[in-house]
Every structure is written in C-alpha cells, then in structure tokens.
Swiss-Prot record:
Quaternary structure and partners: F-type ATPases have 2 components, CF(1) - the catalytic core - and CF(0) - the membrane proton channel. CF(1) has five subunits: alpha(3), beta(3), gamma(1), delta(1), epsilon(1). CF(0) has three main subunits: a(1), b(2) and c(9-12). The alpha and beta chains form an alternating ring which encloses part of the gamma chain. CF(1) is attached to CF(0) by a central stalk formed by the gamma and epsilon chains, while a peripheral stalk is formed by the delta and b chains.
Chief place of localization: membrane
Family recorded in the similarity comment: Belongs to the ATPase alpha/beta chains family.
InterPro entries linked to this entry: ATP_synth_asu-like_sf, ATP_synth_asu_C, ATP_synth_asu_C_sf, ATP_synth_F1_a_nt-bd_dom, ATP_synth_F1_asu, ATPase_a/bsu_AS, ATPase_F1/V1/A1_a/bsu_N, ATPase_F1/V1/A1_a/bsu_N_sf
Protein name: ATP synthase subunit alpha
Keyword line: ATP synthesis, ATP-binding, Cell membrane, CF(1), Hydrogen ion transport, Ion transport, Membrane, Nucleotide-binding, Translocase, Transport
Topological relation to the membrane, as annotated: Peripheral membrane protein
Amino acid sequence: MSFNIKEISEMIEKQIRNYNKEVVQTEQGTVVSVGDGIALIYGLDNAIMGELLLFSNNVYGMVLNLEEGAVGSVILGDETLIREGDIVKRTNKVVETPVGDALLGRVIDALGQPIDNLGPIDFTKTRPVERVATSVMARKSVSQPLETGILAIDSAIPIGKGQRELIIGDRQTGKTAIAIDAIINQKNRNVKCIYVAIGQKDSTIVQVVEKFKKYGAMDYTVVVNAGASQPASLQYLSPYTGITIAEEWMESGNDVLIVYDDLTKHAVSYREMSLLLRRPPGREAYPGDVFYLHSRLLERAARVNENYGGGSITALPIIETQAGDISAYIPTNVISITDGQIFLSSELFNQGVRPAVDIGPSVSRVGSAAQIKSIKQVSGTLKLELAQYYELESFAKFGSDLDETTKATLDQGAKIIQMLIQKQFNPLEQVDQAILLLTIKSHLLKWLPLDSIYNFKHEILSHFKNDQQAAKLRKKLDEQKTFDDQLQKEILKQAQKVVLKITKNIKEYKPEAFGNITEYQNLGK
C-alpha cells in the first residue's frame, strides 16, 4: 500500500484553513469528600455564594462555604448518588422557586416542587429565594388590622397587616393551633396565606392540610413542607422559599399571611450545616451569623406603599421554648427582631385555658394602631384588669380575709379568663368580639356565676344573630365600627336580657345580691 504524500499534505492544509476556533468554557470541579449532606469540591475557584451546582445523576447542591482551594456545598437531594471523584458543574444561577397563583392549594417542597400527587404546577415565573429586604422608603406604617378571630389576641395583642408577631411557648401549648386558626379566619378576607412547616412530622403536616381542606382554607393557601425526614439543607431553605412566594403577591398589591412553624428547628438545621462545614461555633454551638439568619428572613415581611405594589406580608414566626425559658439564645434573638410576641403558658394550658395566651408578657408593639375603633374603645382596661387579678390571686392563696373590692377584682378576673376561652376552629367576627368585650368592660358579668360564663358567651352571640332587634344593633355596630353612647346603651340592654334569662334558670341563685341589674348605673359608661 503506497501513500501519496502530496494528497495527505493537501488534506491537512485544507483542514487547517477551514478550522474555526470555538472555545466552549465550562467550569467544573471534583468532589473531594461527601457525607452528612455536605460535599467538599475542588476546582470551582470562581463559584459564588449561594450558587446552584449540578452534580452527576442530576443532583443539585448550593454553595455555602468559599474556602481557599475548595468550595463547601450543601446537597439539595439524595446524597447517596454522589461519590468522591464525581464531576461537579457550575450553573451560574442561584436557587430559584416558582411563584404566582398557580401555587394556591398546593403542597410543595423547599425547591418549589409539588409533593401532593396533584400533578405538575403550571407556573410562569420564578424568583431567587435570597433577596435584600424591602427598603425603608418603600415601606408604609401598619394601620390595617389582620383579624385572627381569636378574642384574646384581637383584643389585647392586636396584629396589623405588615407586622411580625412572634408566637412563643413550650411544646404542646397550642402554638400551631393559633397559627392555623389565623389562616382559617382569612377566608373571604382577600388575604393569601403560606404555611411553612420546618422539621415537622409528615403525619402532622397531613393533619394540618386536612384541616385546611375541611374549612376551605386551601383555596387561598400554599403549604411549603420541609419535614423531619428531609435533609437539613431543605429545612434551612424552606422559609426563604415561603417569603419569596409571598413577596411576589405583595408586589402585586395583595395582603399575605405567612406562618413559620417553627424557627427553632430552622436554627437547629442551620447549626447542623454550619458545624459540618467547619464554621466556628459560638453560644449554644450556633454559628456567629444565626441572628442574621432570622433577621434577613423576617425583615422581608413588610407593608409597602403604592409605588411598590401596595401589598403587605404579615409574618407569624413560631419559637419553641424549653421549660418557659424565653431568655435562651434563639428566643431572645427572634423577640428582638419581631414587633411583639404572643406568649403561651403551659400552666394556663394545663388549667384548661385555651388558647393559653399569657397576656402579661405578651405584647404587640405596632398592632394597636391597626385595631378597629369599636374594639379599642372596650378593650383598653382588659390587660390591666387581668394583671390586677393575677397579682391579687397569688396573695389570696395565703389568706381568706379579703375585703369586698379585692373579692370583686378576683371575681371579675376569673370571669374574664372564662370569656377569653375559645374552642379551636371557631373564629369570632370583630363585631361579636366588640359586643363580648363591652359586657366585660361594663362589669355585667358580676350578675353571673363563674360556671355559667361560657354558656353566657354562646347565648349572647346567638341572641345578637337571631333576635330581630339585637341583630339590627349588631349590623349597625358592624357598619359604623365604633360605639356611640346610644348604641352602647341599647346593646347592653339586650345583653341584660340574656343575663336575666340565664340566671332565671339557675336554682337557688340570687342575682339580686349584686344589685338590681335593670337599674345598674355603670352600663354604657
């Protein structure tokens, strides 16, 4: 076989002449070590913080550590598919989540993927999960009430749209119940809701979703679930996914309520990742930036002015305490970030007071500006009366020699507590709350025995809905949202009828001992 050197040289020359220089640049690195949801990668010198990385087998990771010569990444998927020596590619993108109305009624994971077996989500837009909080000049002061339907909260610890109100208490004190009630009460109020479950049992989430479906709340709610079976990276990411979905609605002019259940587990998942990434531990082994972890999340909840959409995000973060210790690291951090807290007491819970709101240490720093006038008129002395009751109650245990004023204060306080007891999934309209609070303020309860207070509450609400004259007064109060002297007197006359009806049916009970109810002078004052 002979070779024609001339033909070969011409062929090579032709190929050289037709050669087009195209450089396709892809940055890739190699997995040095992997374990516990963390991968150490060599060779990605230009990776940026929070960037999405693509491992082999289509598993994604997120950059959280930038070290000299290596990159620390958390794995957002099944780490068992990753081996040492695997190739890792940069995507030049950060983590994004789908947003928009297509998410309503769905249960999604921290990456925005549906996990409710209802098929894919038909979304048209995504947003990066990390974003700088709304600027000061874009914000608007809180002035509209967010109605929870819970008498103890709406009267003494009111929440406004755009506020961050912490729900804090020991385990099994009804923290989630308050948040669920608040979401259920938003039905027909044009408020979209997001429930973020962090580190919860899957069985618990199923129960919550079933409750939402039962009361029609899933029509305006999206559930973001990063359960206890999910890796720490997804538990860490889930609240940011939730607030990103909320921001899209806020900028479209909608009011949004978001619940984080709970941020204690969120901090624990971040601590786990930080320790595995070899970051220096601080107090309680949390990393130094654990305050920033929650502040950058909660500062994204706001009420914005019309130039930025005119919507609002109201946040209800939940924190679980150990033995009522609100001075621990994470509770104090979140208390200092939020605009107030609802403190739930295990002692009250065990006494049968549900919701177990301890009104003493509970406070709402900005919500009072959002309270409607009718409730503000009749709830002003509520906290003071309860504070006096709790103070006197502790002294009353030591002796039975009490003067009449002290006895009256103790009696009124005990009856107020009974009035504030409310069953779950039974939210109250604001007009009904105003009527109940008026009966408390006017000391009408002194004609009733303690064990008939709960019945009185049910009867008076029923009376103002079913009695023709009382229903007209209720409607008038609902429309004008304030008490004038005449309306107040007429409502209390109707309330007197209910008191007389109840006391008449109690054997051997003499309400005359407290004076003539029809001639009582404090009514209406």
